[in-house]
Swiss-Prot record:
Family of this protein: Belongs to the fatty acid desaturase type 1 family.
Free-text tissue specificity from the UniProt record: Highly expressed in the pheromone gland.
Name recorded for this polypeptide: (11Z)-hexadec-11-enoyl-CoA conjugase
Localization of this protein: Membrane
Transmembrane portions of the chain: 37-57, 65-85, 101-121, 185-205, 216-238
Keyword Ion transport in record: no
Catalysed reactions listed for this entry: an 11,12-saturated fatty acyl-CoA + 2 Fe(II)-[cytochrome b5] + O2 + 2 H(+) = an (11Z)-Delta(11)-fatty acyl-CoA + 2 Fe(III)-[cytochrome b5] + 2 H2O; (11Z)-hexadecenoyl-CoA + AH2 + O2 = (10E,12Z)-hexadecadienoyl-CoA + A + 2 H2O
Lineage of producing organism: Eukaryota, Metazoa, Ecdysozoa, Arthropoda, Hexapoda
């Protein structure tokens, strides 16, 4: 067990939640709905993806190697801002941090620019509370495209708005650092995500504006789609060793792009576990290693984990039969 961790042995303590039960939908039977398309969002995301693909071409034709390396470094930092920050820390309170690490995670999160932390946390908490219903912002019962990116191209379902108003976000509102990011979202996040990553290669190693900008967009789009895969692929394809009744699956594809967020069936059963996986360091769960490093430094503490006993009991009770006891576990 990593330093400063806490083993949670009472599953029900974390599963109690008084809320309205929205009807669970099964994909082929999801009620038809006429979505209202947000034209500007369609234009914006279309441009970003086209520009990102052009940036990929430039990586192999005219861009300096340093520009590509710089984009990769920012991709890693931005991803940690999402996975270790917006997700495991602020959405689920899976661990606690001291101010220096919290500032770092807020800045890293701004590099990724997947909306403000406030909005990200709100949508994610709705997703967990009303998973795969119409109160889930990216309801996977409406198919791959909708849960991947389509939900950002249309107006929110009325049930998402209703449920969102009753969601407890007091911990986020009370955080001055997150209020700062929300208040200055456009200038602050825009500068950290796009302006500095574009100007830095031009200033320090003479990269062209065309190359610097389009590779910045490539890094941004690659990060976005990695996160999107957790909403789409990890709710459609894969095995379910912990709870076969959930749409959430164990997705190697999503895991590869998100530093350990693809163990999604486990995560939906034990959302408070800071590892988002039974062992936390299997395969490429870099986010857990990132948190463990800062726990070793003393900047992260009270790391919550589910006990092996609870995990096994739950897998045997509700899993699809694919659960295997990890080697070395007592």
């Amino acid at each position: 067990m990593p330093p400063n961790s806490v083993d949670k042995t009472n599953e029900t303590e974390y599963l109690k939640d008084n809320h309205v039960d929205y009807e669970k939908l099964i994909a082929p039977q999801a009620s038809p709905i006429k979505h209202k398309i947000v034209v500007m969002n369609v234009i914006r995301f279309s441009y970003l993806h086209i520009a990102g693909l052009y940036g990929l071409y430039l990586c192999f034709t005219s861009a300096k190697l340093a520009t590509s390396v710089f984009a990769i470094v920012l991709f890693f930092l931005g991803n940690f801002g999402i996975t270790a920050g917006a997700h495991r820390l602020w959405s689920h309170n899976g661990y606690k941090v001291k101010l220096p690490l919290e500032i770092l995670l807020m800045v890293f999160n701004s590099i990724a620019f997947q909306n403000t932390i406030f909005t990200w946390v709100r949508d994610h908490r709705l997703h967990h509370k009303y998973t795969d219903t119409d109160a889930d912002p990216h309801n996977a019962t409406r198919g791959f495209f909708f849960s991947h990116i389509g939900w950002l191209l249309v107006r929110k379902h009325p049930m998402v708005k209703i449920a969102g108003k009753s969601l407890d976000m007091s911990d986020i509102y009370c955080n001055p650092l997150l209020r700062f990011q929300k208040k200055y979202a456009i200038p602050f996040i825009g500068t950290i995500c796009f302006i500095i990553p574009t100007l830095a290669p031009m200033y320090f190693w003479g990269e062209s504006l065309n190359n610097a900008w389009h590779i910045t967009v490539l890094r941004y789009i690659f990060s976005l789609n990695g996160t999107f895969l957790v909403n789409s692929a990890a709710h459609l394809w894969g095995y379910k060793p912990y709870d076969k009744s959930l749409k959430a699956t164990q997705s190697g594809m999503a895991n590869a792009f998100t530093f350990g967020e693809g163990f999604h069936n486990y995560h939906h059963v034990f959302p408070w576990d800071y590892r988002a996986d039974e062992l936390g360091d299997r395969y490429i769960n870099l986010t857990t290693r990132f948190i463990d490093f800062f726990a070793w430094m003393g900047w992260a503490y009270d790391l919550k984990t589910a006990s092996t006993n609870i995990i096994e009991k739950r897998a045997l009770r509700t899993g699809d039969g694919t659960y295997k006891r990890p080697n070395g576990m007592n």
